[in-house]
């Protein structure tokens, strides 16, 4: 019995081990908020991204990512410390901003098909609440890089200038990432990134890509839908 208990404990720890983020089930969809201490977000255990894409330390930019889900949507919250901001002039929260990655952003790259890892979706949010979503095909790139694809996702962001942290939240329709019926235990291939500041720009990756590009699906981690 003791052996079985220890085995069960080890399995539980492994299920939430390195390279794995759990997205926690919530009862129903909710008004999107970028406040980590409000409602659903409070108490959710996330993961941290603190190094560059090649595994090099990025001091002062240790980013927390939290996730929850419903049958209709998957939600993400980025808690993003910064040293300086690099913001696009004249931001628009009402229309998509192509090439938003030229400025400060937090990013989710997510796909479901483990047999076709070159196909995935990209979602970005800026500290000013700008957004862009892209349909990515690394083997046969889509017209204009896939940015004219529209997932129907929503974002919310705010900047805490006093504490030098910005917060970005996303609500993404589940069907825009994964055609399977959502259920506990489903897994996505996923990675999280940031681009921050200027002179020099800072780059943060949850799972290192070991390349200058973020578009290395072989390096993605795992998101698991949990209770």
Residue ranges of model-derived segments:
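Sec-dependent signal peptide recognition
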Residues: 1-7
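Structural preference for beta-rich elements and adjacent junctions enriched in aromatics
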Residues: 15-227
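Hydrophobic h-region of N-terminal signal peptides that target proteins for export
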Residues: 7-15
């Amino acid at each position: 019995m003791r052996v079985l208990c220890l085995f069960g404990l080890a399995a539980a720890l492994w299920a939430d081990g390195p390279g794995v983020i759990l997205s926690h089930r919530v009862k129903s969809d909710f008004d999107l908020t970028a406040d980590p201490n409000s409602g659903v977000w409070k108490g959710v255990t996330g993961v941290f991204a603190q190094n560059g894409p090649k595994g090099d330390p990025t001091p002062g930019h240790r980013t927390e990512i939290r996730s929850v889900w419903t049958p209709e949507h998957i939600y993400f919250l980025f808690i993003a410390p910064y040293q300086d901001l690099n913001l696009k002039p004249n931001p628009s929260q009402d229309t998509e901003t192509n090439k938003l990655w030229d400025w400060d952003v937090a990013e989710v790259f997510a796909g479901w098909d483990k047999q076709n890892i070159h196909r995935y979706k990209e979602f970005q949010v800026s500290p000013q609440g700008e957004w862009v979503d892209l349909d990515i095909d690394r083997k046969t790139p889509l017209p204009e890089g896939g940015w004219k694809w529209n997932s129907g996702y929503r974002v919310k962001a705010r900047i805490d200038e006093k504490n030098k942290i910005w917060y970005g939240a996303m609500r993404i329709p589940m069907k825009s990432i994964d055609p399977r019926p959502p259920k506990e235990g489903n897994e996505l291939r996923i990675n999280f990134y940031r681009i921050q500041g200027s002179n020099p720009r800072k780059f943060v990756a949850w799972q290192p890509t070991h390349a200058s590009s973020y578009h290395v699906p072989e390096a993605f981690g795992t998101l698991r839908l949990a209770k």
